[in-house]
Amino acid sequence: MAAPRPCADGPCCSHPSAAPGVQQTLDEMDFERGIWSAALNGDLGRVKYLIQKAVDPSQPDSAGYTALHYASRNGHYAVCQFLLESGAKCDAQTHGGATALHRASYCGHTDIARLLLSHGSNPRLVDADGMTSLHKAAEKGHVDICSLLLQHSPALKAVRDRKSRLACDLLPGNSDLRDLLAS
């Protein structure tokens, strides 16, 4: 078999001789073309277009993340709202057990956490490390989200992760939050 030749205008990414960093995996190409990239970037128009073309709003990518995970993590409220209204599963879990509520809580997006809870998201779900959304919010010192989660489920204070830590054990030093979680 002959060795691949470069294209007339230089190396092609489909050739083994392509420059490193130019090659993309099929997973990366699927991600960029799929609903996940649109949600990650807050591209509501593209998300709507893909949903209208019968893309499942809860379809996971190769890592188990859904469009709702990406939109929640990046604070794209309108995209989250549209996905939920289009039937996205609010409690879909990644391979590591994270939900969209975990992502919103960790990243400090109170409005999205509130939206997810209003659509029935379960704040008691744990990820592979045994952490709830409260653990994630406490770890980053997000007072408003901790308060919101405790309003929905006061029992979260007593949940220990796989290392036997309570949410209050993960605090970065915020005494107001420590009082809220310890009481």
Curated annotation (Swiss-Prot):
Species in which this protein is naturally found: Bos taurus
Family that this chain belongs to: Belongs to the ANKRD39 family.
ANK repeats: from-to residues: 30-59, 63-92, 96-125, 129-158
Gene field: ANKRD39
Database matches in PANTHER family: ANKYRIN REPEAT DOMAIN-CONTAINING PROTEIN 39-RELATED, BRCA1-ASSOCIATED RING DOMAIN PROTEIN 1
A Pfam family reported for this protein in Swiss-Prot or TrEMBL: Ank_2
Modified residues (Phosphoserine): S153
InterPro entries in the record: Ankyrin_rpt (IPR002110), Ankyrin_rpt-contain_sf (IPR036770)
The name this protein goes by in its record: Ankyrin repeat domain-containing protein 39
Keyword Repeat: yes
Coiled coil: none
Keywords: ANK repeat, Phosphoprotein, Repeat
